[in-house]
Amino acid sequence: MKQDVTVELTGGKKLHFETGRMAKQASGAALVTQGESVVLATAVAAPDPKEGIDFFPLTVDYREYAYAGGRIPGGFIKREGRPSEREILTSRQIDRPIRPLFPEGFRNETQVIALVFSADKENDPDIVGINAASAALALSDIPFAGPVGAVRVGYVNGEYVINPSYAERRDSSINITVVGTMDGIVMIESGSAEVPEEVVLGAIDFGHTEIKKIVAAINELAAKAGKTKRAVTAPEFDEAYFETLKNKIGARLADALDTKAHPKTESYALVKQIKDELAAEIPADENAGAAKKKLAHYYELLREKIFREQVTKDRVRPDRRGFDEIRQITIEVGVLPRTHGSALFTRGETQALVTATLGTNDDSQRLETFEGEQKKRFMLHYNFPPFSVGEVGRMTGVGRREVGHGALAERAISAVLPGEDESPYALRVVSDILESNGSSSMASVCGASLALMDAGIPLKGAVAGVAMGLVKEGDEYAILTDIAGAEDHYGDMDFKVAGTRKGITALQMDIKISGITGQIMREAMEQARRGRMFLLDKMDEILAAPREEKSKHAPQIRTVQIPTDKIRDLIGPGGKTIRGIIEATQVKIDVDDTGRVNIASSDEEGLKKALAMINDLTAVPEVGKTYLGKVVRLAEFGAFVEIFPGTDGLLHISEIAEHRVKEVKDELHEGDQVMVKVLGVEGNRIKLSRKAVIREQRQKLGLPEPGAEAPAAAEGQPRAERAERQPSSNASTITIEGGEDFDDFDEEGGEGEGEDENFNREDTPNSAPGERRPGGAGAAGNRGRRRRRGRGRGPGQGGGGNRGPQ
């Protein structure tokens, strides 16, 4: 029978929970809708416990179907393949908050599946999926100490926003996912733009208020349609056996766990030796297997009890550090000769070799998302080989843990990357963990920051990360800075915080207990801030700022902005032009729709050559700027000068020289190189002047104007013979080839006679309508010689004036 419930969150967004219509054979199923995003989650557990295991076999799978966003999958297969990185990360976000809420000793295989059936471009289905999974478990017969609720909190214009849309998230300085119960927070996942701790804490508190509404709604639905939970028998605790074991080897085991006296590998060997000695004492009979299993279980419980009592009662850590003390730091940069940037970051017995590689825009990762196709230009990959913990293992594909740790470090660094305008590189950072004893993801953050600075990437600030732990027994608790492996394994909290001196860029928190108070959270954040400052000081001692020069092995990128209407000219028909540049210069060229062109090469000469070719192809003449051009054609009224490849301008006869030019061919010839200034640009018409360049050069050299120092005429000499005859200032009749009667030129001395007002560089005088051609051939065909009335002017003032009196 269908049942549903709706909850309205702050801001007006609604979550609708429904059950009883779909997937009715699952132990629990919930269809959850927000906006037009719809997710079905199911929960199923095997009827019987799985034999021979000492852990809870939980599997969580979150899948996003392409049809949910109205897409057909790309590629040849045309169906969904293996999980994407986003699907893996969301699966982990569902798994981490629910796993601690199953009862101890529950060993039945359990599977939670969340399927995205519909996704709009406003509501991210990942939050819907977490809530759907929680509801499915609450409705099922599977024992579960939930439900949990999940929200995303943004911070836009000083206001917190619940479940912000994709557009709002782009304007938000925080992107934080908060999951909790009625009593407290159980998981946090966050990326932020160097925000203060108080802003993050405010977002968590704000989110928890909304979480309580969601939990109440799920409880209401479970009350209507939920199944009776299975009975789970709590594992028996043999107090006598445990005390006997403690009295027998407790002191030896405590000494073996002292990692100040014994390094990690030696400590592990001593712990194993004690256990092997106890196992050897077990009689080899039919009960030996069960006895060894019982020994292993209680031996592990004793290790945990020793650790927790030392921390909460004795107030000491396994390696005898203070609660807020960070292990010894060793840093090297530039450790690899051919990489673009590298750093070796060692913290205690955790070591990360981090490299940075610079690429072009073509190297960016292309993603298909519900928002549409996107490009990701920064990637951080985390590798955890088995030798890092002294073990033997298979080197197969990347595991979920590696994907999750890499994503956390990536978020931490993303906030300080320069904009594409400042640094157009695609960036790939790889962290290879060479040794591990806790906090390897935070070592990756520190190493990544150093490697990028070593590569010359202008980060906004250095980023450091520290992992915090918590051990809580009743009202007693201890917050630990820079937790090691045992403190992570036996502690109650793993709280990773990364950021700069200005604020937090990423954090991740997982809780193994039912929840922590706001006071504990604030203390942990402050302790993490002090630890982060200590690490940043250590990093600054080695490399305080990005290197000014990039590696000689890294590609050099030059960026040029071209007009969007020039993109076609650069690419050419079928890409012929751009391919020709690439082949001639051996560079990489990337052009986007905005006209932004990135040219990349490790060869400086090839880069310069390609840049010059692109500038020539796409240059736009600027009024008032001088260019070196080539005379490509002569005409009666002037010359056509090519100032860029394929771009001609008209050098009118009146603008060729300061003196009167009778014939263009007397001054210029085809193929001549001339300096010209752009007087004006009207559409495709470019007006050029050589006279202006000559005048500027003469004035610069301090030379007089032509004719300014002519000798005085002898007294009595006829006036007409004392100076060069000038054109009459009175109206005169001038004969031209073809055309109609019109003024010689405009008031600014632009075009003169013979220039058609529709001139452009694609047209020629022999083909353009209305242009004057020898023999009287005009736009309408051959015409007789026509006469027009013009206004005579002095030399250099216009086309008519240059022709002189008739």
Curated annotation (Swiss-Prot):
GO BP term, pick one: mRNA catabolic process
Binding site residues for Mg(2+): D488, D494
InterPro entries according to UniProt: ExoRNase_PH_dom1 (IPR001247), ExoRNase_PH_dom2 (IPR015847), ExoRNase_PH_dom2_sf (IPR036345), KH_dom (IPR004087), KH_dom_type_1 (IPR004088), KH_dom_type_1_sf (IPR036612), NA-bd_OB-fold (IPR012340), PNPase (IPR012162)
Catalytic activity: RNA(n+1) + phosphate = RNA(n) + a ribonucleoside 5'-diphosphate
Annotated Low complexity bias: 704-717
GO cellular component term of the entry, any: cytosol
UniProt-recorded name of the protein: Polyribonucleotide nucleotidyltransferase
Gene giving rise to this polypeptide: pnp
